[in-house]
Amino acid sequence: MKKMNKNADPTVVITGVTDLDHAVVSPSSWLQESLSVPREEGYIDVDGTRIHYFRWGDNTKPGIIMLHGFLAHARCFAFIAPYLAADYHVVAYDFSGMGDSGARETYPLAIRVEELLSVAEQTGLNDHEQKPIIVAHSYGGHVGLAAIDEHAEQFSGIIICDLMILRPSVFEEKPELSKLPGQQAGKRQNRIYPNYAAAKQRFVLSPPQAVEQSELFDFMAFHSLKEIGGGWSWKFDPGLFNIELGSDRGYLHTPRKVITVESRKAIIYGQESTLFTDDS
């Protein structure tokens, strides 16, 4: 790895194997292998908030920037990015209010776009003659689409993974979607659980589905939590539930934006996904 440190905060080159400590009891060989690939970890400042990122690979290669889903974190890609790093310069980061990044008073989509642009610039993704490709999962797709819609010249394209794309009429018919991010009012406090086991019991997949890969479930659960106040609680900022995207019912506009954004686009979705149907 060719080390890069454009930002003021020091960065460290490490492997992610320590991410398995206390997270996965008996990790498979492939998971250990993927996390043994060296990566850079650091922080950059975006509008007064520290943004946590990981970087893999050689910065002389074309770039990929990876955007995680709502209430998730960059470690969603920790076991995927190392394989891409053989051919690409890969960066994944935590949105503010999630993972190990700092919190904000509010989370408008405009600040999400600013974070994306700043991370791409400060980690060197923009230095290559080929502009980076956005790989965006779920909520990250809204951020990626907004960024590429406003700054198409700064990206080579976008790959959208399991972003909810439904007709407005179908959206309205599904009452369970009223609990989507931004649809709730008020700022609640995250509960503090007495121990990790109690906290982990509250970790679920969304949408609800069977756990097919228990080690990845355990990995994601552990890194979604933190020790605090003598117990364990979620890393995410509860203020996220008032994000601008939900308050203006932005999900209703997603299908049109996917069509109208002028850029190279690809969509990947789960065969049995409830967020992307045959009608989509």
For every predicted segment, state its role.
Residues 226-280:
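Conserved serine/cysteine hydrolase catalytic core
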Residues 49-100:
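Conserved HGGG/HGGXW glycine-rich cap/lid loop of the alpha/beta-hydrolase fold
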Residues 65-69, 137, 269:
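The conserved beta1-alpha1 loop
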